[in-house]
């Protein structure tokens, strides 16, 4: 069972600045969100046997806070779980970017400018790394902390466009639960936030 978690809130999330692969830490709210999610998993008696996280600070911090108090012997830091690279636009305000490129984050097949990683390339690396993780972990409870754009690109692939990119945003510290069987991913929970008290 794969629990795919978007990192906790950062100040750039709050101020609607495009983070991409900039190494931004969690805000105080983000820290509390991650702790709360960890307590939720413990209350549900979910014990992770494997933990994978993007190498970006906000994801790594989230993974550490979620698993505090759990007996986790090893974290696997995986750069392919990173957020999409937004090139020259990283750090800009999202409202300004939408005026410049309305489809920058919604549609596949759009020619990218400003050095932005294409949605197709991001999706390929996410599908590849998640498939590898699924094969290695063989159904055991696995925590994977990544980023909203990356997770959505994966979900777009899995659901043939019914979920994911262009269909909505993932909340900070929401989790999406995937089952891997017969060489295929199956979505069992999506953008789950019902236990969130910290916003």
For each predicted feature, which ranges?
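Short basic (Lys/Arg) and small-residue
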Residues: 147
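Phosphate-handling substructures
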Residues: 67-127, 188-190
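Extreme N-terminal starter segment of soluble prokaryotic enzymes
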Residues: 1-3
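Glycine-rich phosphate-binding loop signature in dinucleotide/nucleotide-binding domains
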Residues: 44-47, 133-141
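Domain-level recognition of soluble alpha/beta enzyme cores
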Residues: 162-186
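Short active-site segment of divalent metal-dependent hydrolases/proteases
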Residues: 10, 150-151
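Active-site-proximal alpha-helix that buttresses catalytic centers in soluble enzyme cores
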Residues: 5, 9-70
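Conserved histidine-centered catalytic loops in small-molecule metabolism enzymes
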Residues: 47-70, 74-79, 179-199
């Amino acid at each position: 069972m794969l629990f795919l978690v978007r990192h906790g809130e950062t100040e750039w999330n709050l101020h609607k600045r495009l983070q991409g692969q900039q190494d931004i830490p969690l805000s105080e709210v983000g820290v509390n969100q991650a702790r709360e999610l960890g307590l939720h998993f413990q209350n549900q008696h979910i014990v992770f046997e494997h933990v994978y996280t993007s190498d970006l600070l906000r994801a790594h911090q989230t993974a550490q806070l979620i698993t505090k108090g759990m007996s986790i012997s090893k974290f696997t830091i995986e750069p392919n779980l990173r957020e999409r690279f937004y090139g020259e636009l990283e750090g800009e305000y999202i409202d300004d970017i939408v005026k410049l490129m309305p489809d920058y984050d919604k549609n596949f097949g759009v020619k990218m400018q400003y050095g932005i990683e294409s949605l197709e390339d991001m999706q390929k690396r996410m599908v590849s790394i998640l498939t590898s993780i699924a094969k290695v972990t063989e159904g055991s409870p696995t925590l994977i902390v990544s980023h909203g754009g990356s997770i959505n690109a994966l979900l777009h692939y899995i659901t043939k466009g019914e979920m994911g990119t262009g269909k909505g945003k993932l909340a900070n510290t929401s989790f999406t639960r995937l089952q891997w069987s017969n060489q295929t991913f199956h979505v069992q929970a999506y953008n789950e936030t019902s236990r969130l008290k910290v916003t």
